[in-house]
Amino acid sequence: MKKSAIALLGLAAILGGCSNQVSYGDAQAVETTTIDFGSTDLQTIAGQMVDSMLMSGSVAAITRESRPIVFVERIKNKTSEHIDTESITDSISTKMLNSGKFRFVDMDRVESVREQLNFQNNDELVNQSSAIQFGKMVGAQYMLYGNLASIVKNAGSDQDVYYKMTMRLMDLETGLIEWADETEIRKQKSKSFLGL
């Protein structure tokens, strides 16, 4: 009986020691758990790009008297990692919109809008006097696009990862690039002698 109780207590202690502990972390805190692209990198890149754009003289000129309509193309991932570039694109779009200087056309949702307008205008269930009419959507004046690239170097137990984000703002009427910039992040990892 005593051996069974001791064995059960020992098993409970072992299983309890293997349990996971979950806690909330600060979403704005610097994340340095891996050399891979992470949330800190996303926030840094999005913030630096939008700040650079808003401080640009050419962007100040085009936003001085109006809020231009921008289409933001999803950032292209040219790295060897799986990086959710939609999150980077969303962060940049949100920061730009919150600046109060731009308006946006969400091209990812245009097909859904088209389906809804077709339903409203071609279905007997919808009161035609309240249906939204075709041809009233506004087109973009500018397109923001870019890519994220990386270079990875390994030397023995050391690893070096260099990320570069490049973005451009193009006037869709003239094809002129109104703004362009790059931001860079370098991360390094070294293993200790014992691999700890």
Residue ranges and their predicted role:
Residues 100-106, 134-137, 174-181:
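Short C-terminal domain-edge/linker segments immediately following a structured domain
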Residues 1-7:
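Bacterial N-terminal signal peptides that target proteins for export
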